[in-house]
């Protein structure tokens, strides 16, 4: 089946699809606080979703392209779930968030098919994959159109990987008690087995969102990167996120001695946002299998246990948390009680001495991850490093922070 035909088949209208902002029906909605964060973007009046320009640009999207798609959404006069929120157009049609970003992705998909130069074609496929992922953002459970966009993103990513430098292998991992999961192993040029970083991504991202991290930071150092989706999304959608948040990643770690391209004696974990919750759990529970753990903007305690901190978080992010936990109809109070159980301090891990070297990077006044969380991580480690990343200039400091983190990982792996 051609890519064009696949797109037509997946998005063929069958029934009135639920609109993304209606999927989580929490009560006690409060006033929306203005929020700005390097990793999550910022709240903009009249938008349900946080607009995450830094990360989208970092993944290769032109700022003008972002504005063009936003303009098409704003200009639509189609019916909306909430007339005050631009990105709540109902149905797969002009003005709908998923429709507009997927339409933009199809433009790059067509460019990729028409391009004769393999590397340039690969770049176009990667661009399309990223746009499909933005279409599916924030990846709420039960969002049928978003899941179809994710399927197209994965297809485009596989096409890109065949044409871009290095090697990518799609791998299946068995997890007892449930469905197997699929991961992507990205390998640099040269002969393996390679030192490898196991990526633990944020809850509002897909595993295919981290190619830039591999290409710009790990591959030049001869380090491979292995990704899997977080529980309840993408290839891990059949698994619910539980208090044992590191379950899937633990089974992947245990399988690495059987993967010939990975040097299982030289493995580190890198966690973004809630992915740091997974990575730090691994540092405690699987320390013999890990040389190091690095975290960026970790969500390990405060956001999960502090009501005041939760009040500062946008509705969309609370919806993401509720969706991952399978609490689509929960009150804020019920969600708060459940989130507290995910705190690694409440679980009795953080605060205990951990033999695994751990680095944690943070931004001052980050509403999702205060400095205290990073200090808690690094002070618990026998070899801890605290890294403050200045906010402005945001893109340059983000790059500088990642260079420092990957250099720290390299010293412990190579």
UniProtKB/Swiss-Prot annotation:
Keyword Hydrolase on entry: yes
Signal peptide: none
EC class of the enzyme, as a word: hydrolase
Catalysed conversion reaction: a carboxylic ester + H2O = an alcohol + a carboxylate + H(+)
Cross-referenced HAMAP family: FrsA
Family under the similarity heading: Belongs to the FrsA family.
Protein name: Esterase FrsA
Gene of this entry: frsA
């Amino acid at each position: 089946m051609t890519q064009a035909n696949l797109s037509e088949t997946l998005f063929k209208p069958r029934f009135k699809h639920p609109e993304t902002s209606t999927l989580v029906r929490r009560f006690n909605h409060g006033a929306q606080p203005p929020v700005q964060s390097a990793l999550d973007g910022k709240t903009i009046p009249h938008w349900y979703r946080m607009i995450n320009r830094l990360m989208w640009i970092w993944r290769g999207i032109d700022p003008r392209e972002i504005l063009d798609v936003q303009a098409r959404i704003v200009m639509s006069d189609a019916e909306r779930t909430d007339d005050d929120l631009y990105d709540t157009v109902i149905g797969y049609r002009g003005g709908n968030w998923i429709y507009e970003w997927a339409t933009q992705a199809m433009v790059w998909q067509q460019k990729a098919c028409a391009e004769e130069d393999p590397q340039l074609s690969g770049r176009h496929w990667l661009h399309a994959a990223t746009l499909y992922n933005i279409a599916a953002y924030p990846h709420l459970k039960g969002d049928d159109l978003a899941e179809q966009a994710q399927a197209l993103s994965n297809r485009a990513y596989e096409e890109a990987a065949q044409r871009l430098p290095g090697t990518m292998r799609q791998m299946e991992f068995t997890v007892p008690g449930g469905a197997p999961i699929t991961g992507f192993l990205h390998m640099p040029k040269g002969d393996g087995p390679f030192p490898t970083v196991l990526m633990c991504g944020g809850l509002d991202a897909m595993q295919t969102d981290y190619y830039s991290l591999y290409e710009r930071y790990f591959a030049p150092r001869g380090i491979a990167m292995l990704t899997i989706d977080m529980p309840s999304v993408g290839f891990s959608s059949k698994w619910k996120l539980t208090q044992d948040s590191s379950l899937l990643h633990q089974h992947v770690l245990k399988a690495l001695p059987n993967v010939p391209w990975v040097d299982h004696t030289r493995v580190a974990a890198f966690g973004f946002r809630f992915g740091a919750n997974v990575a730090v759990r691994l540092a405690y529970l699987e320390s013999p299998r890990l040389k190091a753990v690095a975290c960026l903007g970790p969500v390990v305690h405060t956001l999960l246990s502090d009501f005041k901190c939760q009040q500062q978080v946008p509705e969309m992010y609370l919806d993401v948390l509720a969706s991952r936990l399978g609490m689509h109809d929960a009150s804020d109070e019920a969600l708060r009680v459940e989130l507290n159980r995910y705190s690694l301090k409440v679980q009795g891990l953080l605060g205990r001495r951990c033999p695994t070297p751990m680095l944690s990077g943070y931004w001052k006044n980050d509403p999702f991850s205060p400095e205290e969380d990073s200090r808690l991580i690094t002070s618990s480690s026998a070899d801890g490093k605290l890294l403050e990343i200045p906010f402005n200039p945001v893109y340059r400091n983000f790059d500088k922070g990642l260079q420092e983190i990957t250099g720290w990982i390299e010293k412990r792996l190579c």
